[in-house]
């Protein structure tokens, strides 16, 4: 069974091209900076609805919350 060609460029040609590295020297660090800003600004907490570190325990409630009726419909 002979494999055919898909018409795509070989990966080795892509990685060794100047154009690849010109594009990716900008995009790869940009992704890291965007992720760092997403987390450091607190936007990740707002988007995913998780409590911020200072919101786990409030002034009124300092003990660990225990769930007794987790699957109750009441």
From Swiss-Prot:
With its partner (PsbF) binds heme. PSII binds additional chlorophylls, carotenoids and specific lipids. GO terms for molecular function: electron transfer activity; heme binding; iron ion binding. Keywords: Cyanelle, Electron transport, Heme, Iron, Membrane, Metal-binding, Photosynthesis, Photosystem II, Plastid, Thylakoid, Transmembrane, Transmembrane helix, Transport. Heme binds at residue 24. It is found in: Plastid, Cyanelle thylakoid membrane. It comes from the Eukaryota. It is a single-pass membrane protein. One of its GO terms (biological process) is photosynthetic electron transport chain. InterPro entries: PSII_cyt_b559_asu, PSII_cyt_b559_asu_sf, PSII_cyt_b559_CS, PSII_cyt_b559_N, PSII_cytb559_asu_lum. The keyword Lipoprotein does not apply. NCBIfam families: cyt_b559_alpha. Belongs to the PsbE/PsbF family. This is Cytochrome b559 subunit alpha. It comes from Cyanophora paradoxa.
